[in-house]
């Protein structure tokens, strides 16, 4: 088995999918998991990007079905901007599409800035823009878990195969969640699910960005990665990609393994 095949298997990627079937499987997963845990529903941060829009709509469909079947579940969508979000219009469009039971907004700027100032005062140096970006992601995680803890809700994560293979998420930030309904999907497969669900094309054709950096607001994921999502998707779907692209992907996969594992102990061997 080639490394490419090993990665596809490890990340549960299917080269070809039926969007209708995948939607059904993922809604059922959300329903089954919330029933099994006894939780009261879900909470998810909505950025206006493809991934949170898709996960949010799947969550809302799941809680509606649970209620139609005589159960009780709710979904809270959370906006978590740092000051003014450049693409706020897209976030509002996503909320309109998702139709969450409840939507709330937390501006994380005061919390992030207070922490950054305290860090500088105590340690005598400023946080790098990169590390401050990770603080933003982790404050968003803390906010979602605070809501989840108060309301008895599970925190949904938006990680999918194209992020998992590169480790392109903040450990214990957007990587911190209770369940991941998009696991196994490539970026283009996620787009296909949104198309099937009737989303406005603006929500899945827009340039993906983590938007965590003050110095480079709205920087494209592909710029930071040095790899396009089409190349990632081709690789994950078992297609041929240029040798240098495959090497980049496989190197990122190897060095980011710690992000896909629980914290290491001396009894684990995945890191050796």
Curated annotation (Swiss-Prot):
Matching entries from InterPro entries are given as: NAD/GMP_synthase, NAD_synthase, NH(3)-dep_NAD(+)_synth, Rossmann-like_a/b/a_fold
Q: Which reaction does it catalyse?
A: deamido-NAD(+) + NH4(+) + ATP = AMP + diphosphate + NAD(+) + H(+)
Annotated TM spans: none
Signal peptide residues on this chain, from the entry's feature table: none
Per UniProt, where does ATP bind?
A: 45-52, 158, 187, 209
Q: What does this protein do?
A: Catalyzes the ATP-dependent amidation of deamido-NAD to form NAD. Uses ammonia as a nitrogen source.
Protein name as catalogued: NH(3)-dependent NAD(+) synthetase
> What species was this sequence derived from?
Bacillus cereus (strain B4264)
According to the entry, what is the taxonomic lineage of the organism?
A: Bacteria, Bacillati, Bacillota, Bacilli, Bacillales
């Amino acid at each position: 088995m080639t490394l490419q095949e090993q990665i596809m298997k490890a990340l549960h990627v299917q080269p070809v999918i039926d969007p209708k079937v995948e939607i059904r499987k993922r809604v059922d997963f959300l329903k089954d998991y919330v029933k099994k845990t006894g939780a009261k529903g879900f909470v998810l941060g909505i950025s206006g990007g493809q991934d949170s829009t898709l996960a949010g709509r799947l969550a809302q469909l799941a809680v509606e079905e649970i209620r139609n079947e005589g159960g009780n579940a709710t979904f809270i969508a959370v906006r978590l901007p740092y000051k003014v979000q450049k693409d706020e219009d897209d976030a509002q469009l996503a909320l309109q599409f998702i139709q969450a039971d409840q939507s709330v907004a937390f501006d994380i700027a005061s919390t992030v800035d207070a922490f950054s100032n305290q860090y500088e005062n105590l340690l005598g140096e400023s946080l790098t823009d990169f590390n401050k970006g990770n603080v933003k992601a982790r404050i968003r995680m803390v906010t979602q878990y605070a809501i989840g803890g108060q309301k008895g809700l599970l925190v949904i994560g938006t990680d999918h195969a194209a992020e998992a293979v590169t480790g392109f998420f903040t450990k214990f930030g957007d990587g911190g969640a209770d369940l991941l309904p998009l696991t196994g999907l490539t970026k283009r497969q996620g787009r296909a699910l949104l198309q099937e669900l009737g989303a406005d094309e603006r929500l899945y054709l827009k340039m993906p960005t983590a938007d965590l950096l003050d110095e480079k607001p709205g920087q494209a994921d592909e710029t930071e990665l040095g790899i396009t999502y089409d190349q990632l998707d081709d690789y994950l779907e078992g297609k041929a990609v240029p040798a240098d692209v495959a090497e980049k992907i496989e190197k990122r996969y190897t060095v980011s393994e710690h992000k896909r594992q629980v914290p290491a102990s001396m009894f684990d061997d995945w890191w050796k």
